[in-house]
């Protein structure tokens, strides 16, 4: 549940004011699902004196809920921060999803900027699907990428 996730997240981040005061901080995480932990962590970093907070995410944005393993553990698409941003932009969380999954599209750029703005991040960058596949070392057809691009074949 969300309460337990929040508790675990707080135990993972123990800020040190002497190290953060007036500094530009780069914070890395594996993914952003709902954004709940991100909001709290960014606030803590600023509260402890960070001048800038930059975020780098190891995987591409989660655009689609996982129908296979429940990886995102979402009860619905609107739990995903990406879908909430898409709904704000388009008025429909299901509109033009393939454009929001394409890193070179204006829709993708706008969605990422909205997430950064929502959480007060100085900058936000996600790993690309292409770079992730390259790092894994298998052909894309052997890796499930459904939650990133909606493709379900592997």
Question: What do the predicted segments below correspond to?
Answer:
Residues 1-154:
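PRPP-associated nucleotide enzymes
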């Amino acid at each position: 549940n969300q309460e337990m996730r929040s508790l675990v997240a707080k135990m993972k981040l123990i800020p040190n004011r002497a190290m953060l005061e007036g500094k530009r901080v780069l914070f890395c995480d594996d993914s952003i699902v709902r954004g709940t932990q991100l909001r709290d962590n960014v606030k803590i970093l600023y509260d402890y004196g960070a001048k800038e907070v930059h975020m780098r995410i190891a995987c591409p944005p989660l655009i689609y809920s996982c129908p296979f393993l429940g990886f995102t553990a979402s009860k619905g698409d609107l739990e995903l921060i990406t879908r909430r941003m898409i709904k704000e932009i388009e008025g429909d969380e299901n509109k033009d999803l393939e454009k929001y999954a394409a890193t070179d599209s204006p829709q993708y750029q706008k969605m990422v900027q909205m997430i950064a703005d929502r959480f007060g991040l100085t900058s936000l960058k996600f790993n690309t699907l292409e770079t992730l596949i390259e790092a894994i070392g298998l052909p894309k057809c052997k890796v499930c990428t459904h939650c990133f691009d909606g493709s379900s074949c592997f």
